[in-house]
A protein has these predicted regions:
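Flexible, charged surface loops at secondary-structure boundaries
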Residues: 31, 180-185, 207-210
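Short amphipathic alpha-helical interface segments
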Residues: 15-21, 25-63
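Non-catalytic C-terminal interaction segments of nucleic acid-processing enzymes
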Residues: 1-4, 20-29, 34, 198, ...
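Interdomain/boundary linker segments immediately adjacent to catalytic/signaling cores
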Residues: 32, 46, 63-142
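A general structural detector for well-ordered alpha-helical segments in enzyme core domains, enriched
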Residues: 76, 203-207, 231, 235
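Short, Lys/Arg-enriched N-terminal segment that forms or immediately precedes the first helix
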Residues: 9-28, 119-127
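Mg2+/Mn2+-dependent nuclease catalytic core
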Residues: 193-212
């Protein structure tokens, strides 16, 4: 999705600052490497710093035949920030910590001026559009990667359209991730611990309509124990443990690190008042 100028977007007032007359100064300040990095961000939509560095090594170095150091690339990001062409945020998924970069409104106008083409929608912008937050989007991305690398599923999907399950005329369930192997479907919800209890109850009740195994992944043990477990237990009490037992419902909780190590951190199987720890689970929902 190409960028469409919106005067309400975060940008300076062009009529007051003379942005266009300042473009050449910005271009000189960021140098050739900065121009190439801007072109990569505008044309590829890459937001993760590690991916941008790989592109810089593989593409930019190939085009120029000059070696590029990681230090040079990080200085390039500093120059792009100092000229207000990009913004940088830190993301911690519990599995990895990294920076993401995105074009500012001024950066998009700069790209359109020099590259004669509107920037494509970035990964950052897509996550804002599709998910509760950018952080949530990257948690889903890392969870999907783990599940794909395990090789236990024939397909692992995260698209809202393809994952949508109609429950009734007015209600639908859209799991964050759907893993399919043979004729089995596993539904994963990736939690940041930001839902209020009412929203969480609604999510769990919808999932209980479509699956007997409710699978939650979160970023770390702290969020799992302080937020996710509390919310799960409240929902179980509200719906009724015996009712869920009759449905055969189980709730599985894990972190990204535990999932990577083939572990479910806790399981609520409705036959006991307390959750059980169960390690070594290699397929979603298996006991």
């Amino acid at each position: 999705m190409a960028y469409k100028f919106d005067p309400k977007d975060e940008t300076t007032n062009l009529s007051e600052t003379g942005f266009y007359s300042d473009m050449e100064r910005k271009r000189r300040a960021i140098g050739d490497l900065g121009m190439k990095m801007m072109q990569v961000m505008a044309s590829e939509g890459i937001s993760e710093e590690p991916e941008l560095i790989r592109v810089a090594w593989d593409v930019i170095a190939y085009l120029t035949l000059d070696p590029i150091s990681t230090t040079s690339i990080r200085r390039c990001f500093d120059a792009l920030r100092n000229t207000f062409l990009i913004k940088t945020e830190e993301v911690n998924t519990g599995l990895r910590r990294f920076h993401i970069h995105r074009l500012t409104a001024d950066g998009k106008l700069f790209a359109m001026h020099y590259f004669k083409k509107a920037p494509v929608e970035s990964e950052y912008e897509r996550f804002i559009r599709e998910h509760a937050s950018v952080h949530h989007g990257y948690l889903i991305k890392d969870t999907q990667k783990i599940l794909e690398e395990k090789g236990i599923y024939d397909s692992v999907t995260t698209g809202r359209t393809e994952n949508r399950i109609v429950i009734s005329e007015k209600h639908a369930c859209i799991p964050d991730i759907v893993g399919v192997y043979d004729d089995i479907r596993d539904y994963y919800e990736v939690e940041c611990g930001t839902h209020n209890q009412k929203e969480f109850n609604y999510k769990c009740s919808k999932l209980a309509h479509v699956t007997s195994n409710i699978l939650f992944v979160t970023q770390n043990r702290q969020v799992l124990k302080k937020t996710l477990m509390r919310q799960v237990e409240y929902w179980i009490d509200k719906v009724g443990r015996e009712n869920l037992k009759e449905l055969g419902t189980r709730v599985y909780l894990t972190t990204l690190k535990d999932l990577q190590n083939d572990k479910w951190t806790y399981i609520y199987d409705m036959t006991m008042d307390e959750p059980i720890c169960c390690f070594g689970k290699k397929k979603g929902g298996e006991s």
